Design a protein with these regions (language model features):
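Conserved NTP phosphate-binding and transfer environment spanning the P-loop NTPase/kinase superfamily
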Residues: 3-5, 124-195
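Hydrophobic anchor at the beta1->P-loop junction of P-loop NTPases
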Residues: 10-12
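Walker A (P-loop) phosphate-binding loop of P-loop NTPases
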Residues: 17
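Conserved lysine of the Walker
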Residues: 20
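Post-Walker A helix-loop "phosphate-sensing" segment adjacent to the P-loop in P-loop NTPases
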Residues: 29-39
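Conserved nucleotide-sensing/catalytic segment adjacent to the nucleotide-binding pocket
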Residues: 39-41, 48-97, 113
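Glycine-rich phosphate-binding loop used to anchor ATP phosphates in small-molecule kinases
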Residues: 75-134, 179-195
Length: 195
């Protein structure tokens, strides 16, 4: 990425709780070690307000579809950053279900790079306005296998569910019961939008 010199956007994608955020921060450390100035950005901060979120065929809010993201605002902000403009970055408040602006401004210099992570990171419809040559794409998934014994293992999907339960409780004000209840919808969204 550093050697290419023309990349301004590292687009990271993977299923829910696969380690995208952790990876984006670790990658940022490595990019900084190569003289770049990385700025991690979570696509989740571009969610539309919860009451506007589309519903799936089961009547549940579909947070996994691209239509749950304000794609136009995302592209507007990224293009303005690419042009060197100063942009106020949003933060999605998962407790209130609204996007907020708290005075967090970003402006890119020559050596700056955006490390963007979200389940739709590889979807060209998310970043349709960004020049293709400016993007470097990475897919990742949690493949850590846990074995109960020599013959039985815990599926990686179950490991991701456990990671999501912890994350949702810590950062999104969601109970384990709510996260488990949403998991089938999350899995359907992964099948439709990622795999």
């Amino acid at each position: 990425i550093a050697a290419a010199g023309n990349k301004k956007f590292v687009m990271i994608a993977g299923p829910s709780s696969s380690g995208k955020t952790t990876f984006s921060h670790r990658l940022s450390i490595q990019l900084a070690a190569h003289g770049m100035k990385p700025h991690p950005i979570a696509v989740d901060n571009y969610f539309i307000d919860r009451h506007l979120t589309p519903v799936d065929e089961f009547g549940e809010k579909n947070f996994e579809c691209l239509e749950a993201i304000d794609v136009e605002q995302f592209n507007k902000d990224m293009l303005e950053l690419l042009e060197g403009k100063r942009v106020e970055m949003p933060v999605f408040n998962f407790k209130t279900g609204t996007r907020e602006y708290k005075g967090d401004f970003l402006q890119l210099d020559k050596d700056d790079i955006l490390v963007i992570e979200g389940i739709h990171g590889l979807n060209d419809r998310l970043s349709y306005a960004l020049p293709k040559e400016s993007k470097f794409k990475i897919y990742l998934s949690a493949l850590t296998q846990l074995n109960i014994d020599e013959h039985n293992r815990i599926p990686t999907t179950d490991g991701r569910l456990i990671r999501r339960i912890v994350r949702d409780a810590r950062t999104r004000g969601t109970s384990a019961k709510e996260t488990i209840a949403r998991w089938p919808s999350v899995r359907r969204g992964e099948e439709q939008n990622i795999f």
